[in-house]
Amino acid sequence: MERKSYSIDINRIAQYAMYAYCIFALFSLAFSVCRQAGLSFRTSPILIPISPILVTIKQLVLQLAPIALWGIFRYTLPAGVKLLRRCSELMVLYYVLSFILGQCFNLHLVTMMQNGQITQMASILTWTESTMGLISVIASLVAGCHLCSKHRGNMRKLGIARVLVFIAWLLCSNLLPAAVFYLAGNTQQAAFTCMNLISMITTTSAYIYAYYRMYRVIKL
């Protein structure tokens, strides 16, 4: 594909976003694994005062880095690849919406419960985010299949990475929990703990690889 020229160093921005995402995704994975194992960073006298700050930074980075990477990827695409442009725009829209809704819930700008029931506004916003999440998964899969079939080199590797993300989402969020519940029942806590660990490691690895491949495409 023909590449554009830019007045700002978008490669450097994409590089920082990719590294930040990888670092904090691994930190989030370690945090979750420790929590599953019954450990906590808050028991450390060194990390007690800074752990809330780290968690806040982690949440912001994991929400904002995908916006930057997908936005830059969309910006670098030529006009001829309309399908990829539309899929990228959907991904940016989803991550922006998720960030806004996340901040609304975290800052208590939206009332979640009233008289022991979920408020109508909270239900609408949650449904909207879930719907956009499903649409973004489909858009990511469509983009991945298109990249695999129509392109070569780093673009094709990015397509494979996006397909792997979809497979990880399908297995870890849908098939694996149902299988574990069917086989082990709801009394085998060890089975669910093991499933959660496998899901977290698989999903984190898939996303890190996908954003690395996206950075490689942007860097061309």
Model-derived features: positions:
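Transmembrane alpha-helical segments of multi-pass membrane proteins
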Residues: 12-22, 82-100, 159-172
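Alpha-helical transmembrane segments of multi-pass membrane proteins
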Residues: 21-39
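Alpha-helical transmembrane segments in multipass membrane proteins, preferentially the mid-helix core
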Residues: 133-160, 208-216
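N-terminal juxtamembrane cytosolic/stromal segments of multi-pass membrane proteins
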Residues: 1-17, 219-220
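Membrane-interface helix-boundary motifs at transmembrane edges
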Residues: 74-87, 148-158, 219-220
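C-terminal transmembrane-bundle signature of multipass membrane proteins
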Residues: 27, 86, 146, 164-220
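Alpha-helical transmembrane segments of polytopic membrane proteins
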Residues: 50-64, 123-137, 192-204
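Interfacial non-cytosolic loop connecting adjacent transmembrane helices
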Residues: 35-51, 106-128, 176-198
